[in-house]
Amino acid sequence: MADFSHLDEKGRVQMVDVSDKKTTDRLAIAVGKLSMKPDTLASILDQAMPKGNVLETARIAGIMAAKKTWELIPMCHPLELTHVQVDFFPETETSSIRIEGQARVAGRTGVEMEALTAVSVAALTIYDMCKSADKAMAIEKIHLVRKYGGKSGEFVNEG
């Protein structure tokens, strides 16, 4: 069985002690996809949804969520994020929106969860704002694509 840093020697859950780690610049990038009907995508892009500008609202929600990750995920450390960015890439040929979230910090622990949370909440916000028009939307394949900084170095997800 792999060693899990969130478990102590007795198997109890703990928050990882990062006090001996060096402060380094860290970055994480996550992506996800939201599939929908072509009419729904067109309405989002035309800013014709009844609840307003869907993508800008989702961008703000994703940024806010990244800043609150430590309040949502029990063993995450509170971080002084230096940058959070959420971008949207509409794909008309697949009737979907690719969501990319990026988080940066100069700190002792990584920002993977913050990037993943930004993408997740941005996707949920789009779903919430458009569900009256398209209940069949699907949030898909939210995953980490890149991270660097810290002891483990760089990770690039080729898949």
Curated annotation (Swiss-Prot):
UniProt xrefs under Pfam families: MoaC
Active-site residues annotated for this sequence: 128
Subunit structure: Homohexamer; trimer of dimers.
UniProt xrefs under InterPro entries: MoaC, MoaC_bact/euk, MoaC_sf, MoCo_biosynth_MoaA/MoaC, Mopterin_CF_biosynth-C_dom
Keyword annotations of the record: Lyase, Molybdenum cofactor biosynthesis
Protein name, UniProt field: Cyclic pyranopterin monophosphate synthase
Lyase recorded as keyword: yes
GO biological process: Mo-molybdopterin cofactor biosynthetic process
UniProt-listed PANTHER family: CYCLIC PYRANOPTERIN MONOPHOSPHATE SYNTHASE (PTHR22960:SF29), MOLYBDOPTERIN COFACTOR SYNTHESIS PROTEIN A (PTHR22960)
Claim: Transferase is one of the keywords in the record: no
CDD domains, alphabetized: MoaC_PE
Function: Catalyzes the conversion of (8S)-3',8-cyclo-7,8-dihydroguanosine 5'-triphosphate to cyclic pyranopterin monophosphate (cPMP).
UniProt EC number: 4.6.1.17
Reactions catalysed, as given in the entry: (8S)-3',8-cyclo-7,8-dihydroguanosine 5'-triphosphate = cyclic pyranopterin phosphate + diphosphate
Organism phylogeny: Bacteria, Pseudomonadati, Thermodesulfobacteriota, Desulfobacteria, Desulfobacterales
Binding site for substrate: 75-77, 113-114
MF terms (GO), sorted A to Z: cyclic pyranopterin monophosphate synthase activity
Gene (UniProt): moaC
Family per record: Belongs to the MoaC family.
